[in-house]
């Protein structure tokens, strides 16, 4: 909207001018705990998946702590595969998924069309990583009846 209205030139400009700390539209984040988030997801019938853990800019030590805590709190899966990802990152995330007993998911982290996101491409789970969708309930077959 702000770009269309001429108040900013790009989405990055919107964040810089209006949504950054100290700017008019900034709202300080109010975070829940990982346990609270997982409980809400479970209460609503969902499966808790840790999204794009390779993008949190954490050291291996802190990423392992996050994954261990996530699993201890009842998280079921972690994103292992992304379309824009180095092969060694996918292999490392697969190792972590197996190490912490987490299922795998795949995703593009797609927010809007752009040239560098290949939506749905190069998404595969490495061997030994079970997919989170194996937990999804399958719809029941409804028998046809004569009326």
Each model region followed by its residue ranges:
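Extended, charge-rich helix/loop segments that form flexible
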Residues: 1-17
């Amino acid at each position: 909207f702000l770009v269309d209205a001429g108040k900013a030139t790009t989405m990055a400009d919107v964040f810089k001018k209006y949504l950054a700390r100290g700017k008019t539209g900034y709202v300080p984040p109010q975070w829940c705990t990982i346990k609270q988030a997982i409980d809400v997801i479970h209460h609503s019938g969902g499966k808790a998946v840790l999204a794009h853990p390779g993008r949190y800019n954490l050291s291996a030590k802190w990423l392992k702590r996050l994954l261990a805590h996530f699993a201890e709190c009842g998280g079921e899966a972690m994103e292992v595969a992304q379309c824009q990802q180095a092969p060694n990152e996918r292999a490392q995330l697969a190792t972590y998924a197996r190490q912490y007993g987490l299922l795998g998911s795949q995703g593009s982290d797609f927010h809007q069309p752009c040239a560098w996101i290949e939506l749905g491409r190069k998404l595969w789970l490495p061997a030994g990583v079970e997919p989170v969708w194996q937990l999804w309930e399958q719809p029941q077959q409804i028998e046809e009846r004569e009326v």
